Amino acid sequence: MPNPLYRQHIISISDLSREQLEYLLQTALKLKAHPRGDLLEGKLIGSCFFEPSTRTRLSFETAVQRLGGKVIGFSDGANTSAKKGETLADTARIISGYTDAIVQRHPKDGAARVAAEFSRVPVINAGDGTNQHPSQTLLDLVTIYETQGRLDKLKIAMAGDLKYGRTVHSLCQALKRWGCEFAFVSPPSLAMPDYITEELEEADCRYRALGSLEEAAEWADILYMTRVQRERFDEQEFAKIQGKFNLEASMLARAKPNLRVLHPLPRTDEIHPDVDAAPHAYYFEQATNGVYARMAILSLVLNEEV
């Protein structure tokens, strides 16, 4: 099969077909099993992070270097010409003249698509506001497949901040292609947005609301925890919702043996440290898979054959 992602922007999961996602998934698994250090030889990647990041930025940069490429960029938009008023369109024009691809994180929804419109090289969205995070979704798919042996017809529970959490939005849009069933556990003020539940209905995917993490752990194959993102609230609002849904090891007592607890990280208090030793905990392995998922994205975008 010809590489369907060569020279393509990776902006939103909704832009990708099931076949493209499977191609990415299988490439990530192949690179994990048999690493290659030559796929980005002679390539220069622009790492443009206008918003703080640890795992995403470092795993992308690790992926580039493991593939034989080099990285230039910044980790704080305050230290760029954006602070002087330069538009995102102009920034994309300039950096695309220096590099072979751009990896961008930005606090504004839709920023990745703006950059892609004006860039001369592929743009990979590393998170744009509350909107999309496609590379996180790919590493989630790799992890789910790795732990469950399939993606079809799984029961996926999502808990915490489902309104602003771009990771759960992207993951729903991906897993609906495999006919998964969903359960949501969140305060009403942080419920899954209507546009996501409408997409699930259109795909004939069932979903429900559950009242507790114990229920979710007993029902699900995957329990996907999320952090309430303090940076998206004022202090008064944050105090009202903080700690509403925190997972402890005792809540996993009736979980199925195959249940795995995932989290995009960083966590605060929504997963108690006593969960780390549970056989269901898999979020640190999930983070490691970020390197292989991002190796797959970069390799396929910049090579006709991998």
From Swiss-Prot:
**What superkingdom heads the lineage?**
Bacteria
What pathway, per the record?
Pyrimidine metabolism; UMP biosynthesis via de novo pathway; (S)-dihydroorotate from bicarbonate: step 2/3
Enzyme superclass (EC): transferase
Q: What is its EC number?
A: 2.1.3.2
Keywords in alphabetical order: Pyrimidine biosynthesis, Transferase
* A GO molecular function held by the record: amino acid binding
Full protein name: Aspartate carbamoyltransferase catalytic subunit
